[in-house]
Amino acid sequence: MAVPKKRTSMSKKRIRRNIWKKKGYWAAVKALSLAKSISTGHSKSFFVRQTSNKALE
């Protein structure tokens, strides 16, 4: 079984954790941006089927 020879330093742990958090942050920003563009109808890359409300009235 593979076992690390030495302990990982606190600074290296912090750097890796911050990189991991930053990836999650940017994924959330992109998702929010896409949701905003879909809700306003300005999205050019995401198609949403429009349903008519005439059947409900």
Curated annotation (Swiss-Prot):
The keyword Methyltransferase does not apply. This is Large ribosomal subunit protein bL32c. PANTHER family: 50S RIBOSOMAL PROTEIN L32, CHLOROPLASTIC, LARGE RIBOSOMAL SUBUNIT PROTEIN BL32C. One of its GO terms (biological process) is translation. The keyword Ribonucleoprotein applies. Keywords: Chloroplast, Plastid, Ribonucleoprotein, Ribosomal protein. InterPro entries: Ribosomal_bL32, Ribosomal_bL32_plant/cyanobact, Ribosomal_zn-bd. One of its GO terms (cellular component) is chloroplast. It is found in: Plastid, Chloroplast. Transmembrane segments: none annotated. HAMAP family: Ribosomal_bL32 (MF_00340). Belongs to the bacterial ribosomal protein bL32 family. One of its GO terms (molecular function) is structural constituent of ribosome. It comes from Liriodendron tulipifera (Tuliptree). Its main location: plastid.
